[in-house]
Amino acid sequence: MRIAFSKLCVVRPALTTRLLAGLALAGALLLAAAPRAEAQPTAALPAMSLSAVTTGPARPIAAWAEFCERYPDECAVDRTEPASITLTPALWQTINAVNRRINRSVEAVTDGDHWQAADRWDLAEDGRGDCEDFQLLKRRLLVEAGLPRRAMRMTVVIDEKGEGHAVLTLITNRGDLVLDNKTNAVLPWRQTGYTFVKRESQEAVGWMALGRDASPLTAANR
């Protein structure tokens, strides 16, 4: 079954290069503040939840493959990196800060308006992009803040409207958590209300199915 994807976007203020640098610096500062954050109660961390289970290889999205040709380092899988993030209050603060700031600052536009293309994956470094571009930029900033790329996987879902959408899954010791441009809340995957289709593999450059017999043609532009 193939799934059509929405082209709707909500416009937000543009993100400048200076702000991008500021976001990376903010993440580093939050990590440097770890001793103070560690003094916070454990309740500051998300509750324990179950992780998603992959069921086998899945077909990559063509636009993702093209993105990997342009940005091979963004898709590379380093198996010496941790496969899971051990959350601390400081890391949790960094994750939430990056998610909120990118959601607030990037202007959501369709690939047609942005690139004159049906589907294109890119980093929203010019301050414009659709859902996957938001998540790819968040991942880059989180990597710069010290989190392992291998534990942050681009993920295709079906949203509450039955439309395709792209989110970023963080695989952690407290379960799989989702960063999404449609909400500032970082939620356990089962609490998103989405149907999870597939995500990037942690073992090689490719994709793994998450239990639904569906192969979206593009990532959602939401």
Where are each of the predicted segments found?
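A structural boundary/capping signal
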Residues: 2-5, 36-222
